[in-house]
């Protein structure tokens, strides 16, 4: 199960494209509404979360995903985010974040000494991460980071490959006519 954490102000592309890749691969997902049951994107679109933070049971967690955008500030100081990150660190689940959201992982020490990418606007918030400036997506151990909206499809395909293998990711690539 991939738990997708939604906050008001998330970047639309950074949430939709990776989830589309996961869906095409048949990977189950649950949307967790961090800032409420109804979440509003940067562009004003609303989605309904599947569960609230109080309903979250991580026992079947394979990966957590934090979409970025201007709403990234809404991840900080949220007990559900702290709990999910701690669970992933303890159980070695994957953690994926894109754009500004890798700064949330950095603030929790997850990226200390790890290679990572992020949106340039949060470079100074990346702590002891080893920033990879020429990459769209970076994988280091159980952490997957994407640099921004332009990396959304590639991040989603990388998530599929890590969870279900190269063949599953290639099938999705072919299905969307991806040439990257």
Residue ranges of predicted features:
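Extended, subdomain-level signal for the structured scaffold at the beginning of enzyme domains
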Residues: 1-91, 95, 104-107, 125, ...
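Short, thiol/selenol-centered motifs that function as redox-active sites or metal-ligating centers
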Residues: 98-99
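Conserved hydrolase catalytic core segment
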Residues: 110-111
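Long, charge-patterned amphipathic alpha-helical coiled-coil/hairpin "stalk" segments used as oligomerization
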Residues: 120-122
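Beta-strand-turn-beta hairpins that frame and shape the catalytic cleft
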Residues: 138-143
């Amino acid at each position: 199960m991939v738990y997708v954490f939604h906050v008001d102000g998330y970047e639309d592309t950074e949430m939709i494209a990776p989830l589309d890749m996961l869906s095409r691969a048949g990977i189950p997902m649950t949307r967790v509404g961090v800032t409420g049951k109804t979440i509003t994107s940067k562009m004003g679109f609303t989605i309904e979360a599947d569960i609230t933070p109080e309903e979250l049971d991580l026992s079947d967690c394979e990966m957590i995903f934090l979409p970025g955008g201007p709403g990234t500030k809404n991840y900080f100081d949220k007990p559900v985010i702290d709990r999910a990150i701690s669970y992933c660190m303890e159980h070695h689940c994957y953690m994926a974040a894109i754009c500004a959201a890798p700064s949330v992982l950095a603030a929790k020490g997850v990226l200390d000494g790890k290679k990572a990418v992020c949106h340039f606007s949060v470079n100074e918030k990346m702590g002891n991460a080893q920033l990879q400036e020429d990459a769209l997506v970076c994988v280091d151990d159980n952490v997957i980071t994407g640099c921004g909206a332009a990396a959304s499809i590639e991040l989603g395909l990388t998530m599929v490959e890590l969870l279900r293998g190269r063949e599953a990711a290639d099938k999705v690539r072919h299905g969307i006519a991806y040439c990257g």
